[in-house]
UniProtKB/Swiss-Prot annotation:
Record key words, sorted: Developmental protein, DNA-binding, Nucleus, Phosphoprotein, Transcription, Transcription regulation
Protein name in the entry: Forkhead box protein I3
Subcellular location: Nucleus
Motif Nuclear localization signal mapped to chain: 248-254
PROSITE patterns from the UniProt entry: FORK_HEAD_1, FORK_HEAD_2, FORK_HEAD_3
Gene coding for it: FOXI3
PTM characteristics: Phosphorylation promotes the transcription factor activity. Dephosphorylation by protein phosphatase 2A (PP2A) reduces its activity.
TM stretches of this protein: none
Short motif (9aaTAD): ranges: 422-430
Amino acid sequence: MALYCGDNFGVYSQPGLPPPAAAAAAAAAAPGAPPASRAPYALADYAAPPAAAANPYLWLNGPGVGVGVGVGVGGPPAAAAAAAAAYLGAPPPPPPPPGGAAGPFLQPPPAAGTFGCAQRAFAQPAPAAPASPAGPAAPGELGWLSMASREDLMKMVRPPYSYSALIAMAIQSAPERKLTLSHIYQFVADSFPFYQRSKAGWQNSIRHNLSLNDCFKKVPRDEDDPGKGNYWTLDPNCEKMFDNGNFRRKRKRRSEASSASTSTVAAGTTKSEEGLSSGLGSGVGGKPEGDSPSALLRPPQSPEPPEGTKSTASSPGGSLLSSAPCLNTFFSSLSTLSVSSSGGAQRAGPGSRHLGIQGTPLSSSGAFPASCISSEAPPDTLQLSNGASSGSGQRSSYYSPFPASTSGGQSSPFGSPFYNFSMVNSLIYPREGSEV
């Protein structure tokens, strides 16, 4: 026997029906006979399908409801149409006699012969629960959805603004861009219903922000203005800290502050460098010729050279300044090199240091540009003797107008015979404890 939805759900059960287990046992004992006492259209109406419909799902293609079991699966179309009409809304057929054939597969309820009634029987409402202590005001768990007012919802949600932003919004809303403390309270309470419940806490926070935040300035009240309490306004320099409309603090304030501090440090460094260069320039002009030339050196890291060097470099064709005696010392050392012998050791003069080039000490005043030296030096000073000794010939490769074979054919970075002046690096970047 095939039962459809009867045992599991009890969807189509009727009042006064015996238990499903008992009905199934009775139907198994006497497949063709109805029970002794039953209500019409009970579970006993579910009879065994015909032999041609061994598969319980084949009845869906047959004549269907309202046709007896004797009608096979391949019944006439008229019978199938009548069964469909009876199932979807026609009044049910009369009940079969007690000793007749078994009833149809599925019969609608007797009260109303419609398919919707069967669906209503399927979706029976649950039995009413006992009344809760809250009474009829709390119909269920989702009773909070009954709030229809937007203000009720706004009272529960905290606005996503800081107290500083609320103060700024209040001040910006004023026509004169200034408000008293009481007016700020009133603006916050009127604009956001959340703050209408407890005013003691947030009003205290408003006062703290006004006192501790540098963006809010206190403006005294005029003499002809009645009332009490000072006005509060926004500092014009702090308006960049708030976004348009939201008045939230920007994160760019830290970067702006760092850039401002960097510019301040750069300005202070420039001033100190200017003072250092001016002091060196005055020292060059005021030193007598007998002093050591090392005190007149320009620092290698200084951005501005001394005044004498600036004027000499700007006018390479002009006359040599008389206030720079270090150039004369440099030229005298060159002339000494040209006539010295290989065995003679040069003794360093005052202020000069060893440069590590063929054991020859030169004056530290060689830090001046080579173009200045070549343009101002006399030709007889720059020309070195080729008939000197071997040591002198080796040293002359550094100063000869044409490079030796050891120079590697490098191109001249200077427009002068001193383009292969390999001691320039040691002069620009001193190694041996030179004073800066």
